[in-house]
């Protein structure tokens, strides 16, 4: 049973890679078929080579973009350009390798398959980092509470998550009496040094907190409803080399945040009724908010993150870039496996 569970976990964990290789294989087959077809039509050899390459590239990109990494359509143009550039550089490099390391009596088709296969892993790493960097990511949320047992949590989830989401809440925003301990954030950064840390400040006066947490944060979410000048706070965050995100609740009128959203790289939608408390149910009103923001004409400029009540059933129909969960992951029998399930879940909306 352990072996079967381990296999299932690996299949979920490396889903992107497996499908990337499979799609890559079929794209090469399609490219070679097109190459021979153009040769049959007696089209110039170099032109046949180029046309076949373009067919293979677009085929691989389309399947990876929509069916493997499942990235929002607003990111299509940027991803296509990067995919094309990386693929062309890879193709040129493979041509040079095949030219200088020619083996007699090996056909063009065999040479193309061997050289491209040799670069699959490198290609995957480059495309995942650049072309398809906007795939849906899964983060686990923690309160900066003194009661947090960080080592226990690390043993449960390891490095399997995509990012860390920190909730810092004070009594100006919520009745939840959290004893915030900034030292925990420093430990979190030390425990997950390679992971992006999102810090969500639930406070009407966030400036005092920003000064304490900004060193250990990569993205800072600030609520639209604060009693300070939000644009001044935004500039303060950006001047420190960090990303600014605007956070809203389901009581926030979505149209009223459009001005500040145009200046933001991230949007956080709290999909629960009473922010500041964990373990709540997902409020389906959040779907209307997600749909509204997904249809904006500047959608490609920001990422949408949804936090609150998200489980493996909700994530299937949630068209967001990032999802945050606490109870559904940490409360499961196998949190690391649950993260892998979240990451492998396809959008079926």
Protein language model features and the residues they cover:
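Catalytic beta/alpha-barrel core
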Residues: 139-145, 163-177, 192-212, 217-230, ...
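Conserved, mostly hydrophobic/aromatic
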Residues: 157, 166-167, 213, 267-268, ...
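N-terminal pre-domain/capping segments
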Residues: 136-155
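Glycine-rich phosphate-binding active-site loops on the catalytic face of alpha/beta enzymes
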Residues: 224-226, 271-278, 320-339
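Charged helix-capping and loop-helix junction motifs
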Residues: 177-186, 281-290
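Surface-exposed amphipathic alpha-helices with a cationic face
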Residues: 186-192, 233-241, 245, 287-298, ...
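Catalytic cores of alpha/beta
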Residues: 152-157, 205-215, 252-262, 309-323
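Interaction-mediating elements
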Residues: 2-134
């Amino acid at each position: 049973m352990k072996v079967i569970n381990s296999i299932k976990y690996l299949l979920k964990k490396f889903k992107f890679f497996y499908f990337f290789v499979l799609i890559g294989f079929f794209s090469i087959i399609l490219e070679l078929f097109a190459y021979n077809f153009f040769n049959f039509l007696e089209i110039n050899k170099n032109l046949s080579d180029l046309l076949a390459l373009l067919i293979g590239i677009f085929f691989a990109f389309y399947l990876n973009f929509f069916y493997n990494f499942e990235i929002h359509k607003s990111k299509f143009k940027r991803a296509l350009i990067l995919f094309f550039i990386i693929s062309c550089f890879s193709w040129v490099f493979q041509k040079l390798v095949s030219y200088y390391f020619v083996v007699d009596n090996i056909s063009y088709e065999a040479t193309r398959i061997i050289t491209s296969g040799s670069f699959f892993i490198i290609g995957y790493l480059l495309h995942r980092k650049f072309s398809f960097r906007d795939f849906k990511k899964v983060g686990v949320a923690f309160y900066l509470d003194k009661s947090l047992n960080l080592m226990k949590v690390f043993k449960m989830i390891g490095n399997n998550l995509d990012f860390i989401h920190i909730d810092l809440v004070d009594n100006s925003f919520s009745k939840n009496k959290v004893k915030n301990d900034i030292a925990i954030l420093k430990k979190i950064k030390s425990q997950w040094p390679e992971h992006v840390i999102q810090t969500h400040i639930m406070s009407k006066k966030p400036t005092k907190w920003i000064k304490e947490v900004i060193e250990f944060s990569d993205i800072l979410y600030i609520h639209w409803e604060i009693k300070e000048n939000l644009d001044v706070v935004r500039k303060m965050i950006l001047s420190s080399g960090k990303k600014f995100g605007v956070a809203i609740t389901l009581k926030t009128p979505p149209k009223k945040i459009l001005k500040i959203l145009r200046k933001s790289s991230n949007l956080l939608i709290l999909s629960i009724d009473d922010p500041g408390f964990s373990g709540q149910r997902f409020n389906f009103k959040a779907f209307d908010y997600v749909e509204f923001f997904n249809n904006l004409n500047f959608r490609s400029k920001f990422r949408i993150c949804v936090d609150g009540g998200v489980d493996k059933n909700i994530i299937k129909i949630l068209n967001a870039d990032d999802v945050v969960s606490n109870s559904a992951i940490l409360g499961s029998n196998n949190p690391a496996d649950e993260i892998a399930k979240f990451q492998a879940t396809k959008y079926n909306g």
